């Protein structure tokens, strides 16, 4: 009876169910009726319902579309509808409707969407309350885990699983081949479920949900539901958003379905296989541009390709090769996919067992494509290609065969023809690329190639890596240190060792702490550890060497090199190079303070020196000819500061006796007999380092030997016959030994004071004696000796006296340095005599023993040394410095001796530290040495002033900054590199606004322009002449390029806002000044300033990185943070456009009129500049130039002409390349360094190419016509017969009208000149 009542209510509800409130009862009654087991009632129901099927479908569809109760009513209606279709004896095709099926799918989507907390309230609140208890029962697990409640915020997970399970069952007998829209909607809905279900992952068994979705999608991949290929294509399209999303379960589901289900079905279905092979290509087209999502897309593509068959993989590789020639977004995807393909797919270099492996290799094509993309116009693509090529090199360097093929592919094999040297040239360009990311990637590639090549690299690449160690960016410097250290780690050739030592140790002075630490680490590993290993293996090696008494010097050198492995001799020799030793000292000091120096290093160095001596003696060579390996004593002197207990006194005492007894003059006489050269400078250097070592370990020496050594040193000092380098070492060692000899510090000071004053007194007597001798000889009128031998002896005596006086003066300075409080009152007069000799206006003429000759000419060494010693005395005595500073400045300015000027620069910069306020007025005179004719003086001045500026002893003000600019274009490459590092790294951090504040002034100064009323110099012509030294005057190409190089360097230091401000300042202070008459454009320097301004405004460095229509990709910062970057780009573009319209364009219009009125040649430069400025605003030129229609027309014409010329040039290149290819000529490996990718340029290039081909054909016809061949008779030519106007043939004579038409045919003119 209840079933009868339900049946009646359902039928009544269908007939009058137009109200949405009746749908709930209808759905509930229908579900209750379908749950009954009475077949008779159900058959009656089906019969009654069939007569009103349309009304029923309308009502049930409306219920499934209902948003009531947050979609719960709709999902209950869907459950009831599916239960109806699944019930026994149900007339399925009567009750199945595409519209109702679409409503069912919509109800599933809406039920899974995010719910609002307030949903279901209002008019339905009572119904919610009434059903709460009913829905809130603890329903157990059909669809979720651990028996948790089946709902959360109104979501019933169990109900959802029931609906999906019934949907899958319905699809087994309801075929959708007749309903393509329903099939499409089903695929889309099921593909969306993994994403929509994320909000309910807490109450859903997500894995089971994915399994059910996979079953539904797999079920429709059946011929019963239509064409499988079309269905698979629709599924692939619908799963694409999941495949392209980040790491998530939904993405894993999509990848699993495609790589397993689709791939398994495609094996036996050619049409389905075609769909599957096209899916990765479709994903490539849909891949996003931002870096991280693009990476996920690449991973998805690779997973699908890996699951494909070999044929499909090969087809996709060919597709990737074509992508490399496409648009920028495809090219960047291609370079990201290639390394993954090579590392994931099998046999990239062909079958190892096949003899024709190279022919079957698809990997070589990929490598070649990567190499080509390393020269792409997009910096992002260049950087990605270089870094990915580095990954490929690392992956393929595993076995010997792969290494050999890879070397051949990259052009490193002598046997390869094409591409030889291409990668080397490529690396040289990319390591100095304008984009930092490209330089970093290039250095990474160099590091990987170093391992491949075993460190044997072209010298230019090594120098490029060394130069990169001075890059302005920290990351580039780190990469460069890593790259060149890897080369040195693998290869110990002399060229690699030398370049490493000249590039890496200097990084100990870097501002970045991490780079300093890396420098210490690699020095410890590659220098000290290598020396330590060499010391450990010496004994067995030396024992194995043959003992040959008839040994030449070359054989001995060879034996010594064989004695020390890993190029240790070259390493030690370069360590004591004057350009390397200061950094080695700094590194050893830093390692020593951190207690990282191992005692075994000192023992190894002693072992190296001992074994070298033993080998020398074993060849029966005279011991007085022996010298230790170059650099060994130097490094021992540096490490012994912190390893004094590891150095043996017997060892030092033995070698001191050897070096001290060497008589250079006597040895020179025996040199020819022994066939070995004698190098006295080597002994002097070794003695200095040995004395330094003795000083370092003096506190460990026994008392008696220390006293004996001190007496010996004092005697040698007082003889004044030492080399200047040895004097300092002797003096310092003697001071240290005095501390050892004395029991207290006061006693030690008294001992030092005693021998310092004793030595100074003797030195002053020697100097005075020489001066008096020179003066008396100048007054002597004795007839010169006629005998040559007597004259020679006399000259030799004078030379020895001069040498002794020079050493004496130098010794005084050394003594003053170690004991500043020494009494110098008796020494100053004699030094004053020397440095003022020849001056008739000397103030002390009657008080001091003046030299009657000019010692500057008679004894230049003594003259120079006296200035140096006086400088040391001034450092110890401020009052003395105050008296003599004017003399130092005067001599620095007037001296014609480069060595003296160099020493004076050193002295003056030392004064800057000790007497900062006193020396400030002399800074301009010091900076003049930046333009000194001697390179050494210029470099020394630059380095010393740079250090003072970094330590704030000198300020960047006045002319100092402007004079430093000239070092950027110095003739010396070393100075240019130092200047680039100063401006690009140090100054950019220390004074970031300096380039901006001084930019306009720099333009006037560099052009030596005084034609501006605001920049004119009121001083005399003499000051202008002085300023000319620091200018680059002239309008020639060389001068302009030098100035432009300086401007570009300054622009690179500016922030974007400063570039905008600089643009405005140039327009206001130069262009506007010229149009207002403040800048005289008839003056040559004024014209140069104006032309420079035009060039600067048109250069790319002053333009901001985000321009109109430009893509968002850059190399340094990829597309991350796209919204912020886009907003910033719009703001910058708006600011530039506003500035152009309001400020720049009116100035240009006024200035153009002025230049035209004066017939100035600068009009062309102005037009070129304006064309470059407005090329990004082609569509707005009419609006911008509304005030000057003529200028508007001229600019449009110039732009069109420029673009046409550019297109014609590219077309000519393309035609030439095509011709050479047809003629069998090999194409360039890198094709083109500049692949222009402009939106409108491609069509113009195609059009121009067609014109070029047609013109070429026309020229060939003209050449044949002009070749002298006579025109054949008309009867011999194959031509159609002509009839007269009357229809009668005129006996072989052509009609007059036809001849006239031929006369009027168009003439082809040769345009070879175009």
UniProtKB/Swiss-Prot annotation:
Expression sites by tissue: Present in buds.
Disordered as annotated region, ranges: 116-150, 1210-1237, 1265-1314
UniProt HEAT repeat ranges: 20-58, 98-136, 184-222, 231-267, 269-310, 331-360, 361-398, 417-455, 457-493, 494-532, 821-859, 878-916, 917-954, 956-992, 1053-1091, 1138-1179
UniProt lineage: Eukaryota, Viridiplantae, Streptophyta, Embryophyta, Tracheophyta
Originating organism: Arabidopsis thaliana (Mouse-ear cress)
GO cellular component, one term: condensin complex
Any single biological process term in GO: mitotic cell cycle
Protein's name according to its UniProt entry: Condensin-2 complex subunit CAP-D3
Domain of life: Eukaryota
Keyword terms: Cell cycle, Cell division, Chromosome, DNA condensation, Meiosis, Mitosis, Nucleus, Repeat
Subunit description: Component of the condensin-2 complex.
Gene that encodes the chain: CAP-D3
């Amino acid at each position: 009876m209840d079933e009868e009542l339900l049946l009646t209510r359902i039928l009544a509800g269908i007939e009058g169910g137009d109200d949405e409130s009746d749908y709930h009862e209808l759905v509930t009654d229908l579900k209750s009726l379908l749950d009954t087991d009475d077949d008779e009632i159900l058959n009656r129901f089906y019969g009654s319902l069939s007569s009103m099927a349309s009304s029923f479908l309308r009502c049930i569809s409306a219920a499934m579309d209902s948003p009531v109760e947050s979609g719960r009513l709709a999902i209950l209606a869907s459950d009831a509808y599916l239960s109806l279709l699944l019930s026994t004896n149900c007339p399925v095709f009567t009750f199945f409707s595409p519209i109702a099926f679409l409503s069912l799918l919509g109800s599933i989507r809406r039920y899974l969407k995010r719910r609002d907390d307030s949903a279901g309230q209002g008019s339905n609140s009572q119904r919610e309350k009434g059903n709460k208890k009913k829905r809130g029962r603890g329903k157990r697990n059909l669809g979720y885990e651990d028996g948790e409640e089946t709902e959360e915020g109104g979501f019933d997970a169990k109900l959802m699983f029931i609906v999906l399970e019934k949907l899958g069952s319905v699809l087994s007998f309801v075929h959708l081949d007749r309903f393509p829209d329903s099939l499409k909607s089903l695929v889309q809905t099921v593909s969306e479920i993994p994403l929509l279900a994320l909000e309910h992952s807490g109450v859903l068994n997500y894995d089971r949900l994915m399994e059910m979705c996979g079953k539904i999608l797999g079920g429709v991949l059946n011929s019963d539901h239509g064409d499988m290929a079309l269905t698979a294509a629709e599924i692939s399209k619908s799963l694409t958003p999941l495949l392209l999303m980040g790491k998530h379960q939904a993405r894993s589901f999509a990848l699993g379905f495609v790589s397993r289900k689709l791939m398994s079905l495609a094996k036996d279905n050619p049409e389905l296989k075609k769909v599957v092979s096209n899916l990765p290509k479709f994903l490539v087209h849909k891949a996003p541009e931002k870096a991280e999502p693009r990476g996920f897309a690449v991973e998805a593509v690779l997973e699908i390709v890996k699951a494909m068959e070999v044929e499909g993989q090969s087809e996709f590789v060919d597709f990737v090769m074509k992508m490399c020639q496409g648009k920028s977004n495809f090219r960047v995807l291609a370079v990201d996919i290639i390394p993954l393909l090579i590392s994931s797919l099998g046999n990239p270099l062909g079958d190892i067992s096949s003899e024709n492996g190279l022919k079957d290799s698809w990997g070589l094509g990929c490598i070649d494509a990567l190499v080509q993309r390393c020269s792409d116009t997009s910096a992002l693509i260049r950087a990605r290609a270089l870094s990915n090529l580095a990954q490929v090199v690392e992956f393929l360097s595993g076995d010997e065969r792969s290494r050999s093929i890879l070397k051949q592919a990259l052009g490193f094999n002598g046997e390869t023809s094409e591409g030889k040297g291409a990668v080397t040239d490529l690396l040289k360009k990319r390591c100095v690329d304008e984009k930092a990311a490209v330089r970093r990637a290039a250095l990474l590639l160099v590091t990987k190639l170093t391992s491949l090549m075993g460190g044997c690299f072209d010298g230019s690449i090594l120098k490029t890596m060394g130069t990169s160690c001075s890059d302005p960016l920290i990351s580039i410097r780190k990469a460069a240190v890593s790259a060149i250290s890897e080369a040195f780690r693998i290869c110990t050739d002399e060229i690699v060792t030398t370049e490493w030592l000249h590039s890496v140790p200097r990084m100990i002075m870097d501002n970045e702490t991490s780079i300093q630490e890396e420098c210490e680490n690699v020095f410890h590993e590659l220098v000290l550890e290598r020396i330590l290993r060499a010391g450990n293996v010496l004994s067995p090696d030396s024992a194995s060497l043959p003992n040959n008494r008839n040994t030449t010097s070359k054989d001995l050198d060879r034996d010594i090199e064989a004695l020390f492995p890993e190029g240790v001799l070259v390493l030690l020799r370069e360590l004591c190079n004057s350009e390397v030793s200061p950094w080695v000292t700094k590194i050893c000091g830093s390692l020593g303070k951190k207690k990282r120096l191992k005692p075994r290093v000192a023992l190894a160095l002693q072992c190296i020196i001992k074994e070298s001596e033993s080998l020398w003696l074993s060849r029966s060579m005279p011991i007085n000819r022996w010298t230790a390996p170059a650099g060994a004593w130097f490094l021992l002197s540096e490490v012994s500061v912190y390893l004094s207990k590891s150095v043996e006194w017997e060892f030092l005492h033995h070698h001191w006796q050897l070096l001290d007894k060497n008589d250079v003059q006597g040895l020179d006489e025996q040199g020819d007999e022994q066939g070995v050269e004698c190098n006295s400078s080597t002994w002097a250097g070794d003695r200095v380092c040995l004395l330094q070592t003795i000083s370092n370990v003096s506190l460990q020496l026994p008392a008696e030997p220390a006293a004996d050594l001190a007496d010996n040193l004092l005697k040698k000092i007082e003889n004044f016959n030492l080399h200047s380098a040895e004097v300092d070492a002797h003096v310092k060692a003697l001071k240290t030994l005095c501390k050892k000899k004395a029991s207290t510090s006061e006693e030690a000071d008294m001992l030092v004071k005693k021998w310092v004053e004793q030595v100074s007194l003797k030195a002053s007597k020697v100097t005075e004696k020489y001066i008096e001798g020179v003066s008396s000889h100048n007054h002597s009128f004795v007839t010169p000796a006629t005998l040559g031998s007597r004259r020679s002896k006399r000259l030799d005596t004078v030379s020895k006296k001069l040498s002794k006086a020079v050493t004496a003066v130098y010794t005084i300075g050394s003594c003053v340095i170690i004991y500043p409080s020494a009494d110098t009152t008796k020494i100053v007069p004699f030094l004053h005599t020397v440095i003022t000799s020849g001056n008739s206006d000397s103030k002390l003429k009657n008080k001091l023993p003046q030299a009657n000759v000019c010692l500057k000419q008679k004894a230049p060494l003594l003259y120079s040394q006296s200035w140096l010693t006086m400088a040391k005395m001034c450092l110890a005595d401020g009052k003395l410095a105050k008296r003599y500073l004017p003399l130092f400045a005067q001599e620095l300015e007037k001296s014609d001796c480069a060595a003296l000027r160099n020493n004076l620069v050193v002295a003056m910069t030392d004064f800057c530290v000790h007497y900062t306020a006193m020396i400030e007025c002399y800074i301009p005179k010091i900076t003049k040495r930046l333009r000194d004719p001697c390179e050494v003086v210029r470099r020394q001045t630059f380095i010393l002033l740079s250090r003072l500026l970094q330590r704030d002893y000198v300020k960047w003000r006045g002319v100092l900054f402007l004079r430093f600019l000239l070092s950027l274009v110095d003739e010396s490459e070393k100075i240019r590199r130092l200047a680039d590092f100063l401006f690009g790294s140090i100054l950019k951090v220390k004074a970031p606004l300096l380039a901006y504040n001084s930019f306009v002034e720099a333009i006037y100064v560099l052009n030596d322009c005084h034609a501006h009323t605001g920049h004119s110099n009121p001083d005399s012509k003499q000051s202008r002449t002085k300023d000319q030294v620091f200018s680059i005057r002239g309008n020639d190409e060389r001068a302009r390029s030098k100035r432009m190089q300086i401007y570009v360097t300054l622009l690179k230091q500016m922030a974007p806002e400063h570039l905008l401000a600089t643009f405005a300042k140039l327009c206001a202070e130069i262009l506007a000044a010229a149009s207002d008459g403040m800048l005289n454009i008839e003056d040559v320097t004024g014209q140069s300033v104006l032309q420079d301004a035009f060039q600067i405004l048109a250069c790319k460095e002053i333009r901001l990185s985000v321009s109109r229509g430009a893509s968002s990709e850059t190399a340094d910062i990829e597309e991350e943070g796209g919204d912020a970057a886009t907003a910033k780009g719009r703001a910058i573009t708006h600011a530039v456009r506003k500035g152009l319209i309001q400020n720049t364009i009116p100035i240009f219009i006024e200035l153009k009129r002025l230049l035209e009125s004066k017939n100035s040649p600068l009009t062309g430069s102005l037009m070129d500049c304006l064309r470059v400025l407005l090329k990004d605003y082609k569509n707005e030129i009419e609006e911008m130039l509304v005030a000057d229609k003529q200028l508007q027309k001229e600019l449009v014409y110039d732009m069109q002409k420029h673009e046409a010329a550019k297109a014609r040039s590219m077309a000519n290149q393309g035609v030439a390349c095509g011709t050479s290819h047809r003629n069998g000529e090999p194409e360039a490996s890198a094709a083109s360094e500049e692949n222009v990718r402009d939106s409108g340029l491609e069509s113009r290039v195609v059009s121009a190419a067609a014109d070029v081909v047609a013109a070429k054909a026309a020229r060939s016809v003209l050449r044949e016509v002009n070749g002298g061949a006579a025109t054949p008779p008309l009867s011999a030519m194959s031509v159609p017969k002509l009839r007269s106007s009357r229809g009668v043939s005129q006996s072989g004579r052509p009609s007059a009208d036809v001849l006239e038409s031929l006369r009027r045919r168009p003439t082809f003119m040769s345009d070879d000149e175009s």
